[in-house]
Amino acid sequence: VPIICGGIHPTSLPEETIKEDCFDMICLGEGEGAMEDLLQRMREKRSYTDIKNLWVKDASGHVHKNLKRPVIRPLESIPHPDKSLFVKYGALTSRIMIMTTRGCPFACTFCVNNFRNAVYSGEVYLRQRAVPDVIEELIDIKKTYKPKKFRFEDDVFAFNQKWLDDFQVAYRKHINLPFHCYVTPSTAKDEILKSLKEAGCESVSM
């Protein structure tokens, strides 16, 4: 079974990562499109050495370094994650994690998002899901897994006041569970914190 490594480590250090004997290929950047193509090629027993976003070792040890594909837009085009495997292996707790954005509006030099912006220079890496799509996923999770609270894992959850105002109304109406999220000192303004509180936010991290 081929072993693939993805995430920020191979994205930021591909040359180092692909040298590891335990990996047959690595994925740079977002993986949804690359994995879909890879599985289709494997199902059809076709070569997959030319799939964008993948670096693939062939039988001779040569590494095929493919180009990256554009970032996924809109994020609503990605199906909601299937969390049933987490239940099967006992990894789903009463506090369920979810993400509404990819990227960050800031470019702090010490942060991985600064690197992501450089990797995708020429594109805007920051994307935010529409409120109805987020609420739809939350409703499904609430109905299926009955969590006690949510944890939004966005690097910065509260930065778009208009989005937050719409989210606040919809979240209170359809979800109404406490949640945790991340903010920055520059986004922790009175109006944003008020909206978070009214939506049901019980704690934040900076």
What are these regions (language model features)?
Residues V1-V71:
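Glycine-rich beta-alpha loop elements in corrinoid/cobalamin-binding modules
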Residues E76-M206:
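Radical SAM [4Fe-4S] cluster-binding motif and immediate context
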